[in-house]
Amino acid sequence: MIGGDATVYTSRPSLGATMKSAEISGTNQLSAKLSKKVSTDDLKGKVTVTDADGKAVDVKSLKADGTKVIITADKDLDVRGKYTVEIKGFGSQNAIAGSVVRTDAFDRKYAYSGEDLGATFTKKQTGFKVWAPTAAKVELITYKSVDPNAEIDQTIDMTSESK
């Protein structure tokens, strides 16, 4: 067994260095956790970041702190996006929104102060509103009855609007 690895091996795995995880940790930062300590100098020329379309993301700076690597991008990252972080000798991991959602910058940009989230009912219609700034897709599912085993009636793709 390898810590953090759910794979069931049928032969002895290589216990080389690996990247355990990656996340969007700031508006223009990604963080990666490695299986062994590195220095910032060890990383020079070894880190690449690509977006969901495979396009390279320009890296402004790197900082290593033990087994944690902080990658600062040249521009803000899309919190709904998926990025791939690759570090030569450690492999790659997909990074999605992580600790970025607990930052002041995230709150300033995405906080919602309205009081109309959830279902808003009138005699003519029921409207549904959710706050999901990191979601790439949100679906509303309605059922044919209130029975817990009821069949799905409709699946409706919700649209993204400004706050």
Name what the model sees in each region.
Residues 129-163:
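Aromatic- and glycine-rich beta-strand/loop motifs that create alpha-glucan
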Residues 73-82:
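Surface-exposed, short loops/turns at beta-strand junctions within beta-sandwich domains
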Residues 86-90:
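Beta-strand-rich extracellular modules
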Residues 24-31, 63-66:
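Residue-level recognition of beta-strand termini and adjacent short loop/turns
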Residues 63-73, 161-163:
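Aromatic sugar-binding surface patches on proteins
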Residues 3-5, 10-28, 93-135:
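Non-catalytic, glycine-rich low-complexity segments
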Residues 33-43, 131-137:
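Short proline/glycine-enriched turn/loop motifs at strand-loop junctions of beta-rich domains
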